[in-house]
């Protein structure tokens, strides 16, 4: 198409999202290798691409426009590796007073991600030889924790804790459409609101959520979340377990099932039993609730159960499938 290409180099997905957002790009492509190669399309703000953008890209490929593009239309690839330094500065800004007196260890299956995480904590004055274990997801977008007592705290509860303190400070949050429903109840308690952006919106119904999310990049960046979590521990002088006591106990279980009919048909039949969402339906049950979302392709249905314990959430999924 003759578009200019900016190359961010070898980065985590979270770094790529930062680069797309910081540089105000319309679209970004994150390419991963390994046993299964993947190309992920990011839209404005480093958020999931919209359906119109996907259709536009599909049209370019279907029409073979890249084949007909003259050689003179191809621009030199711009080396944007320097954005990684700007990303590091953004990480440091998450803890303007440093992390001296705090201890935590970094862990990630991606060695580069672990090195970056540990280096960031160390430069901020954090003791990285002991303390809670901060697990960064391989793509860099999520954070989970094993506290000093050995209890594993999943990403969803860490996200809920971070959102809670945003509510306490009088701010709304923007989260993915499949984020825990418990966070909405927490927001109501403080007179705040949770805006949700879709995985692949067909229109601009989630535009406000996307606008807010562009200013809350740390909620979808595991390293930023980790740094801000440690800042919270330092500022309050409380342990992670004490902070989490303010978050309602909940657990989530996700399942994907293949249907013999269209997911849309099933959701239509369940329409009267639940509350419609922008991209699915939420069914309330005595012991929790289930979020049902159709897949973008095929006849797969994604089920997210949320309840007080993983066992109850698993039972909710089983009862629905029966």
Residue ranges and their predicted role:
Residues 47-70, 158-190:
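Glycine-rich phosphate-binding loop plus the immediately following alpha-helix
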Residues 139-141, 146-151, 155, 165-322:
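Phosphate-binding and adjacent anionic-ligand microenvironments
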Residues 36-131, 148:
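Gly/Ser/Thr-enriched, mixed-charge loops and adjacent short helices
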Residues 2, 96-104, 166-172, 190:
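Short, surface-exposed connector motifs at secondary-structure boundaries
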Residues 1-39, 117-152:
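N-terminal small/polar loop signature for handling phosphorylated ligands or for N-terminal nucleophile
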